[in-house]
Amino acid sequence: MKVHFLGTAAAEGFPNVFCRCQACQDSRKAKGRNIRTRSSVIIDDAWRVDYPPDAYYQAVRDEIDMSKVNHLLLTHTHYDHLCAGDLLSRTEGFAHGVEEPLNIYGNDLALHQCRIGFFRGRQYSKAIYDEKINTF
């Protein structure tokens, strides 16, 4: 199993862009791995857990071919874990040569945000399918 951590920070990222504490200042100076984006992980190049606002940057930074990711597990709907509007770039007209659909797994609210809340009824055109996960 291949696990690639894309981000390990909390909702504000690290360093917090508004914070002047010593830890955040030191992180800015050190750069590199000391700059942490919001939480997400890729498993076996096919599964992504969560889609934060940093998803575009994470994919470009780490040279991730997001067209190969065909499963997206949404853990919850906090803004630092789900930026559903960015998924529009995977639909026809934006993404070309994508062969597999993106299967989205999550609770009712997560799926609603992906399906209706952000896309306003736009057809996914075989690009995105969703599946409800029953919670315990």
Label for each model-derived stretch:
Residues M1-F136:
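Binuclear metal-dependent hydrolase catalytic cores
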